[in-house]
């Protein structure tokens, strides 16, 4: 993997954690909604499939809540590390481009609009920022087998 691709992959970690958190929260909402509004079959026949048993419900909620807590922890540690590395860049424009792209998740045109430049300039700043960004040694060793 090329060095710039490796850096992009590293920077995208934060957005990946944000997406996972959103998905887990949506799953929790769905499970809670299903429990609050169970489907009812009005066919006049008795149904004995344990609607009063909350252990499965509680277990699935507990598992997802633990996963959510862990993912939030990973998001925070990822944010702290990535933002610290971005802040080490000398150029404020390079810092802005990386922050807006990889922390805020903005598209190129949104970054250009926010910073008052054309997209071509934003891509140039992005390339320079990636060249100046330093990755942790363990990431480089893991990816490149050094």
PLM regions and their residue ranges:
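N-terminal interaction/assembly modules
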Residues: 1-87, 110, 135-146
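DNA major-groove recognition helices of helix-turn-helix
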Residues: 82, 122-136
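Hydrophobic positions on the alpha-helical face of helix-turn-helix-like DNA-binding modules
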Residues: 98, 111-112
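N-terminal positioning helix adjacent to the helix-turn-helix/winged-helix DNA-binding module
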Residues: 78-81, 92-94, 125
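The short coil/loop that forms the "turn" connecting the two helices of the helix-turn-helix
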Residues: 116-117
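Short amphipathic alpha helix immediately N-terminal
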Residues: 89-104
